[in-house]
Amino acid sequence: MAEKNRSKLLRLTVRNIGCIGDEGIEIELDNIVCLVGKNNAGKSTILRAYELAKGTVTFDVHRDRHQHAQEDQPSEVLLEVHIPEGIGNVDAKWKYAKDDFLVVKSRWCWDAPSFQRIRTTWDPTAGPEGKGDWAEDSKAGGADSVFSSRLPRPLRIGSLDDAAKTEDMLLTLALTPLFTALEQARSNSESDLARAIASVSQNMQVLSGQHEEHFNIISNRVSAGFKGVFPALDVSLQIGSAPLVPKLSELLKSGSSLRVKDGAAETELSQQGTGARRALFWSMLQVHNELTRDKEVRADFRKGLEKDIADLNKRIVKPAKGVDVAALEEELTNAKAQLQAHDSGGPIPDSPDDPAFPGYLLLIDEPENALHPMAARAAQRHLYKLAESPDWQVVMTTHSPYFINPFEDHTTIVRLERSIEGANAPITPNTYRSDLIEFEGDDKKRLQALQHIDPSFSEVFFGSYPVLVEGDTEHAAFMASILEKQHQLIDRVTIIRARGKAILVPLIKVMTHFKIDFGLVHDADSPFKKNGHRNGMWTENDKIRTSMQAARQAGLTVRHRISIPDFERRLGGEEASKDKPLNAYLQVTQDEVLAKAVQELLTELLSSDQHEPYTSEAIQATGYMPLLIGDVTKWAEQNGLGEDVRFKNQGNA
């Protein structure tokens, strides 16, 4: 398969670089990795660390060295990379099999005081017990430059790259094939271009000859002045021109521009906004590298044909005993025909074994910069589509939920945050991997639908304390109580709408997998429907609590509250109406007592010592569901609904 025939980054570990200290950070890679977290949490440092290891940027002590590192603590980048069979110069002895990959582990260190870049390779069979150790006298791939060429190729797009730089890169990408063709034509003395350049040089010589008398007068005057100082010396002025070697690439770039059509209007790229320029850059980057890959594949195929032809010639000149020379000559003729067809632009024959090449690694900072929300969604789809290619991996840093899609296959989300306050506090990663979480039935499809309807769901990954709610009414009430009142909770919590009670259980699984502490409030609902049938939403109550207990067993702190029978009537309102979110918002905004009650509920969900809706003693004595049934029954009786079919006979619910 093609994805197994591309080098691929599997894991990256960074120590004592940028804001990352000696405790280090380990990032597991996937098709696409989204790095999230507050500013100065190490996201861009991760991208730069790969560039440092690959050698595309140089280690700068003042910029890259962790300020609090001790002198005996090296700055370090460790890569675990899949290096497929077929990539030359990396011996099989350095590879070990893991999850269908052939892994090579290499480490780059920068030690005080010189901070020279030193690479070592993990030998899987070294060490006292043969369980592996860092090799001391050799390394995979030999020379660093050779091994680096086998690694995935990084393409870095910074968040602050200016417009001029972007257009220059775009022009270079677009014109590179033409640059190559022009240089080939200039080096061929028989080409029209080479003859034209030679003609210009000849014309310059002719013009020089026509002005020879004037040149000689100047030469004599210079010589006379010079001999006045040094009588024994003479000087002559020789007029001529150096060979004309025009910088074709600069001439082309200075005269070229990219044009953007918008209906009937056509403008230069420099007249477009930053977002349009960045989006065009991503698109051209992908196309350029696909063309480059095609060129590499064709060159590799041609090299193989040339080798076959050379081998066949040798076997024909000195045939082994019993060899059918006529058959060899026919094979040689076919190989030469293939080479001729290939050089004429013919397609490469299909092969079950794709040639092995380094993959590409797109390192992009804050792709949301300067993009309209609609464009941001389109850009997200573009980047995820790019990551589906076996040639590409994408690692992005982002502060936008529009670029997070946790339910796309082969997606990893890593939140970087400091475990405590302080510039030297350790940075700890929380990792979510879409392929490692198991959903039941159509839960994943429901979550994908939720993500499409409301991309703000992905705010759960960005750092503040998430509170899960069923829908828009709770969201409106909570937002009114903290936004309109400018409550201190405004910067501490994120309200996440499930848009349906049945979505809460899979959302709890997401939180548990990502290891995020959270709060949850939902409706109790009635045990029965208006027709007397069992209410599926009542059954969800027990499922939700079971999921909450599983989250606690995984080490999370989760706080759980229930609205009896629903959030609208918890606020003192009527049963749900179509305008309930707006009504709830206005009600909480205008009623100070109600606003305070909602704030207290939110505070409980954030920091209460009681994590369950009921005390542990009450649950142990009576049971969770009997307590809930009792509360709902009591509410129904107090509100004149004791005989309502939805609430009676609850002992059988």
Sequence positions of predicted segments:
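Extended helical coiled-coil dimerization/tether regions that scaffold
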Residues: 3-4, 165-170, 178-361
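Conserved P-loop NTPase catalytic core
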Residues: 355, 385-389, 393-396, 402-464, ...
